[in-house]
UniProtKB/Swiss-Prot annotation:
Domain of life: Archaea
Protein name: Orotidine 5'-phosphate decarboxylase
Any single GO CC term annotated in Swiss-Prot or TrEMBL for this entry: cytosol
The protein's role, per its UniProt record: Catalyzes the decarboxylation of orotidine 5'-monophosphate (OMP) to uridine 5'-monophosphate (UMP).
Active-site residue numbers: K61
EC numbers, comma separated: 4.1.1.23
GO annotation, biological process: 'de novo' pyrimidine nucleobase biosynthetic process; 'de novo' UMP biosynthetic process
Length: 222
């Protein structure tokens, strides 16, 4: 049984000891570019290797031609999955990245809707067409956009939906899951806390209680 609905967004370092204490309370870890710029690739790898989490996701929001994106991900082999933007299109870009990841048993998430206020939905149909053509493992839909989560869950019933923007960006814990997301991505509310483990446990309890009320179960059947 999966342990949690929470993916820890790591944009700044936490000690290995703290991460080991939290591993049983997490689904996964999302590695942000600021963390890798601070530590470097080798130290980031050393920090994460040995952690018992379901998924390590590198979130550089890749947005380039296929050759460049492949050159980036091949240097980050410690990760299970990678996040890329959808708007860059398929041919010569996401198609090449997806083939490379498939060949190396890695997963792809595509950004569908970002969590910030300025994100435009004018190109939503185009984004959805790209997602359908690429068929990634999952999609990223901002946790502050609950109506969009519900819409994307309806349109992409079997895909994993991960939702950032919970806590510090204004999303309420548990709301994204109730709207249709599988996991909520939470960073600053945990890693900036005086006791990250206590903060994580508190958040997990809030999510569990809310999801039990809205869905009657902690995890959905796929």
């Amino acid at each position: 049984m999966l342990k949690s609905r929470v993916i820890l967004a790591m944009d700044k370092p936490l000690s290995y000891q703290v991460l080991k204490e939290m591993e049983n309370e997490l689904y996964g870890i999302k590695v942000g570019l600021p963390l890798v710029l601070d530590l470097g690739v080798d130290k980031t790898r050393e920090l994460l290797i040995g952690l018992d989490v379901e998924e390590i996701i590198v979130d550089f929001k890749l947005a380039d031609i296929g050759y460049i994106m492949k050159s980036i991900v091949e240097r980050l082999s410690f990760a299970n999955s990678f996040i890329a933007h959808s708007f860059i299109g398929v041919k010569g870009s996401l198609d090449e990245l997806k083939r490379y990841l498939d060949a190396n048993s890695k997963n792809l998430y595509l950004v569908a809707v970002m969590s910030h206020e300025g994100w435009s939905t004018l190109f939503a149909d185009y984004i959805k067409n790209v997602i359908r053509e690429i068929s990634p493992k999952g999609i990223v839909v901002g946790g502050t956009k609950l109506d969009h989560i519900t819409q994307y869950r309806r349109d992409f019933e079997k895909m994993t939906i991960v939702s950032p923007g919970m806590g510090s960006q204004g999303g309420s814990y548990g709301d994204a899951v109730c709207a249709g997301a599988d996991y909520e991505i939470i960073g600053r509310s945990i890693y900036n806390a005086g006791n990250p483990l206590t903060a994580l446990r508190t958040i997990n309890k809030i999510i569990e209680d809310k999801v039990m009320k809205c869905k009657g179960a902690i995890f959905r059947k796929k």
